[in-house]
């Protein structure tokens, strides 16, 4: 259940990083489904505003992401530390009159992933906004998010909130283990898929002359080393 997952994730961050989340209905939001939370450090120091935008609606794109509306920076003259405003955006199924918003395991993992990105922004403490939060080298930007993902299969974390929405039964350890055991399914294919993206990027962005050839043939040659399934004709990656 979404509300329980949110409590679990916020509680995890509180235990790991000694921070607290306080809902503030006085902060303006851009849609009635959005909630705003102020984030505070262990000594009560204000850290950030976090917006949660969990449900689909007309005009909202699909997927999940973190957005920084206002980055962190420090005024060199006054020393004032301007704190960030960030949002985590999902497309979880809305609750109905008869059923709360229920999440799949993948959606819980996605929640943790985007929440990890938001923590990267929330903990920023730099002089320049251009170097704070997720404004880092791209090979590092996914580290905080993927670190947080790992807790999705930690029983100690799951036992703080993961209960059946009707019976209250705690998630069985056997089910958690089955999720862990299945985590390597198709992992080699997923790896090759990412390799193919890299091969194609390198093929296009290492060129130093205009391209005037056959795009489909060029792309096919670029990622042919990582291709294991039949090619769908008349398509490009």
Task: Please state what every model-predicted region is.
Residues 1-237:
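Cation-handling catalytic/transport regions enriched in His/Asp/Glu
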């Amino acid at each position: 259940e979404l509300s329980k997952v949110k409590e679990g994730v916020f509680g995890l961050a509180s235990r790991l990083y000694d921070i607290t989340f306080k809902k503030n209905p006085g902060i303006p939001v851009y849609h009635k489904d959005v909630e705003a939370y102020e984030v505070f450090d262990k000594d009560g120091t204000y850290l950030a505003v976090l917006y949660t935008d969990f449900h689909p609606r007309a005009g909202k794109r699909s997927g999940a992401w973190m957005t920084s509306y206002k980055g962190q920076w420090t005024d060199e003259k006054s020393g004032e530390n301007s704190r960030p405003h960030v949002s985590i955006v999902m497309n979880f199924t809305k609750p109905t009159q008869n059923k709360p918003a229920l999440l799949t395991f993948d959606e819980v993992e996605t929640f943790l992933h985007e929440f990890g990105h938001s923590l990267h922004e929330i903990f920023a403490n730099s002089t320049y906004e251009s170097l704070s939060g997720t404004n880092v080298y791209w090979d590092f930007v996914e580290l905080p998010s993927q670190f947080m993902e790992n807790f999705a299969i930690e029983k100690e974390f799951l036992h703080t909130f993961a209960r059946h929405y009707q019976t209250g039964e705690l998630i069985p350890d056997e089910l958690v283990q089955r999720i862990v055991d299945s985590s390597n399914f198709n992992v080699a294919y997923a790896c090759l898929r990412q390799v193919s993206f890299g091969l194609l990027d390198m093929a296009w962005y290492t060129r130093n002359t205009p391209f005037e050839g056959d795009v489909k043939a060029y792309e096919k040659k670029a990622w042919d080393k990582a291709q294991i399934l039949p090619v769908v004709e008349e398509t490009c990656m």
